[in-house]
């Protein structure tokens, strides 16, 4: 302990960082590279995290946004669909091109797809609570015919969208939303439509719920709350909002320790720290080390749940063995 350093308590949230769906998606790309060799194409960022994407690029993954970007001479190479899910048109397009694809869609996102399709199969118009333009929303809307889904982003949308005549309604939601915001939208829908149908199971995933609850526990009284995550990560941005609502004096989203605005955050006593579901633990460690350079740091754990969940990869990749270094990367610690 150093006498000339100000004391800083870091409230470290648990759970934080990689969830089972993210872990599985990264593992699929690493396993595909091991089994088939580079390059392996990945449609969209496998998860929304620059560190992960750059690490996979170094191993031989090539990230694309459209199947047209795969050159003719590489049409026999594997292509992986991201954890966020894709519209039905994407695998159909891949099949039409005779591409070999591996679908890394999170099983909990696939569950929402099935819930939406069930609503539609039962003759209901589907309301999707989510954010326009997010890949998961694009993928879920793309499971159903054009016009079969209405996107609801706000309570205002819930109160004023024109419902189709003579059709029952059913709703699902994006898996990474704020629990409170989604509850308000659902409440508005249920007040407006007495017979609206809920999904058979909760759409917001366990990892989103757990990370938000941990932030709620750690944020009150924090001088600053940092969330490790990318600007395009929906669940990470929601954690910043949750921290602010729960009582943090200020909350920021950072991708690396280099983004910490040191000149703006002098004289901290309590720092809250969490990481979005696509952010690796190695960056959390990096941030703690950066604060330890300037402060006498003590770490206080704010653990609100355990996460034993594990999603297996597809059968085609189960015969591949990963090295310790591979597993460290997959688990976000290397």
Curated annotation (Swiss-Prot):
Binding site for dimethylallyl diphosphate: 48, 84, 134, 233-235, 278
Cofactor(s) needed by this chain: [4Fe-4S] cluster
Enzyme class: oxidoreductase
Function per UniProt: Catalyzes the conversion of 1-hydroxy-2-methyl-2-(E)-butenyl 4-diphosphate (HMBPP) into a mixture of isopentenyl diphosphate (IPP) and dimethylallyl diphosphate (DMAPP). Acts in the terminal step of the DOXP/MEP pathway for isoprenoid precursor biosynthesis.
Keyword Iron-sulfur: yes
Record's catalysed reaction(s): isopentenyl diphosphate + 2 oxidized [2Fe-2S]-[ferredoxin] + H2O = (2E)-4-hydroxy-3-methylbut-2-enyl diphosphate + 2 reduced [2Fe-2S]-[ferredoxin] + 2 H(+); dimethylallyl diphosphate + 2 oxidized [2Fe-2S]-[ferredoxin] + H2O = (2E)-4-hydroxy-3-methylbut-2-enyl diphosphate + 2 reduced [2Fe-2S]-[ferredoxin] + 2 H(+)
Pathway(s) annotated for this protein in UniProt: Isoprenoid biosynthesis; dimethylallyl diphosphate biosynthesis; dimethylallyl diphosphate from (2E)-4-hydroxy-3-methylbutenyl diphosphate: step 1/1; Isoprenoid biosynthesis; isopentenyl diphosphate biosynthesis via DXP pathway; isopentenyl diphosphate from 1-deoxy-D-xylulose 5-phosphate: step 6/6
Binding locations of isopentenyl diphosphate: 48, 84, 134, 233-235, 278
Keyword Transmembrane on entry: no
Origin: domain of life: Bacteria
Enzyme Commission (EC) number: 1.17.7.4
UniProt-recorded Gene Ontology molecular function terms: 4 iron, 4 sulfur cluster binding; 4-hydroxy-3-methylbut-2-enyl diphosphate reductase activity; metal ion binding
Organism, as annotated: Chelativorans sp. (strain BNC1)
Protein name: 4-hydroxy-3-methylbut-2-enyl diphosphate reductase
Residues engaged in binding [4Fe-4S] cluster: 19, 106, 205
Active-site residues, record numbering mapped to chain: 136
This protein's UniProt keywords: 4Fe-4S, Iron, Iron-sulfur, Isoprene biosynthesis, Metal-binding, Oxidoreductase
Binding site for (2E)-4-hydroxy-3-methylbut-2-enyl diphosphate: 48, 84, 134, 175, 233-235, 278
CC cofactor note: Binds 1 [4Fe-4S] cluster per subunit.
